[in-house]
Swiss-Prot record:
It comes from the Viruses. Residues 1-40 are annotated as: DNA-binding. It is found in: Host nucleus; Virion. This is Capsid protein. It comes from Beak and feather disease virus (BFDV). GO terms for molecular function: DNA binding. The gene is Cap.
Length: 247
């Protein structure tokens, strides 16, 4: 009859007409204009981050006191901004009001490569953030690893060295400073930040404030092992302060 058809084309048109349409994502006809918002530019309390590094040699002496037995020893590293400032020939000038050390990295690798080290022993590294770290400069032989029981201790092999990151903590007493009459006050602004002044403060001892610290233990090897040690500090400075005018 007229108006009816059993062909495939007619069935497809009827099904397409009454079927639920697919939901499509709206396509913008015109390109949207970019809106430029004015960024806030702070003129005070700007924070500048600098990376400071230094390298030195460290040796683990061979065992001579108890040959044939396994003995351990330990050492530690603390951080001070003054250790990273070069005095000669070009002394560094820090024209900032305050600073704080946000992150530190210690890396120690054997100078001859790990293939040349004939020792397979391992020790541990641990972050110690109080004055107790000074106890780990051992001189007497230890029959057990003194850092293995510490929370957060990590194993390192004497033939490969290690690399470890930590957040140093400023010391709050004056016993660890090079001079006893220098103050190590923190000038805490809040519970989370501790800015140490550079320009003022008692005796201007800001750069000499010690920061704790990482301790590392090692088995005493049968031969002396020489390492190259690299320390890296990520230091934040604020409030750029140029030189004072002459009076």
């Amino acid at each position: 009859m007229w108006g009816t058809s059993n062909c495939a084309c007619a069935k497809f048109q009827i099904r397409r007409r009454y079927a639920r349409p697919y939901r499509r994502r709206h396509i913008r006809r015109y390109r949207r204009r970019r809106r430029h918002f004015r960024r806030r530019r702070f003129t005070t309390n700007r924070v500048y981050t600098l990376r400071l590094t230094r390298q030195f040699q460290f040796k683990i002496q061979k065992q001579t006191t108890s040959v044939g037995n396994l003995i351990f020893n330990a050492d530690y590293i603390t951080f001070a901004l003054d250790d990273f400032l070069q005095a000669v020939p070009n002394p560094h000038a820090l024209n900032f009001e305050d600073y704080r050390i946000k992150l530190a990295k210690m890396e120690m690798r054997p100078t001859g490569g790990h293939y040349t080290v004939q020792s397979n022993g391992f020790g541990h590294t641990a972050v110690i953030q109080d004055s107790r770290i000074t106890k780990f400069k051992t001189t007497a032989d230890q029959t057990q690893d003194p850092l293995a029981p510490f929370d957060g201790a990590k194993k390192w092999f004497v033939s490969r060295g290690f690399k470890r990151l930590l957040r140093p903590k400023p010391q709050i007493t004056i016993e660890d400073l090079t001079t006893a009459n220098q103050s190590a006050a923190l000038w805490l602004n809040s519970a989370r930040t501790g800015w140490i002044p550079l320009q003022g403060g008692p005796n201007s001892a800001g750069t000499k404030v010690r920061h704790y610290g990482i301790a590392f233990s090692f088995p005493q090897p049968e031969q002396t092992i020489t390492y190259v040690t690299k320390l890296t500090l990520y230091v934040q400075f604020r409030q750029f302060a140029p030189n004072n005018p002459s009076t």
